[in-house]
A protein has these predicted regions:
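Generic secretory/membrane-interface signal
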Residues: 1-2, 82
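Glycine-rich, low-complexity segments
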Residues: 2-38, 154
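Terminal beta-strand-rich extracellular "head" domains
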Residues: 33-47, 51, 56-154
Length: 154
């Protein structure tokens, strides 16, 4: 197999991808926005008001990108904070973002996950907790839970 090293002329001559390259497509996007601040001092994960969405997949062979765009913040007391995403009543362990000894007013992001192979309506949630010793964990106003259903290309 020959190795081709593109130069500037070769690259500028590329106008489109060949038709034979497979691509997926976005089927649907749904969002839920947190419209007011939410805080908790509970050491168990607590539902964040506004970050919950029921969604029905259009095809069980599709996949879903599930994410929350936004931040959690530690209050001014010693201790830690954490967030996790929940699918159909079960926490998605891989989405946990925690700091057990967070600095004052530290911000952490929420996690993300890819979910597939289900049918029917399921619930998606963003949850936060305050690790013992911390007076509060805050989910900032404007955090948005997003569900993107897509058809994979493979």
């Amino acid at each position: 197999m020959a190795i081709i090293k593109p130069n500037n002329n070769t690259i500028s001559a590329i106008t489109a991808l060949p038709a034979a390259i497979p691509t997926g497509k976005v089927v649907a996007v749904s969002t839920a926005e947190q419209t007011s601040g939410f805080e908790t001092n509970n050491s168990s994960y607590t539902d964040v008001t506004g970050l919950s969405l029921d969604y029905t997949m259009q095809s069980s062979s599709n996949k879903i990108i599930f994410t929350v765009h936004g931040d959690i913040q530690r209050g001014s007391q010693d201790g830690g904070i954490g967030s996790v995403l929940e699918f159909d009543g079960s926490e998605i362990t891989e989405t946990k973002v925690e700091d057990p000894a967070a600095a004052d007013n530290l911000y952490l992001p929420y996690g993300s996950a890819i979910v597939d192979g289900y049918s029917g309506s399921k619930n998606f949630k963003g949850k936060i907790r305050s690790v013992p010793g911390n007076s509060k964990c805050i989910s900032r106003t404007g955090s948005t839970l997003t569900i993107i259903e897509y058809t994979p290309w493979w």
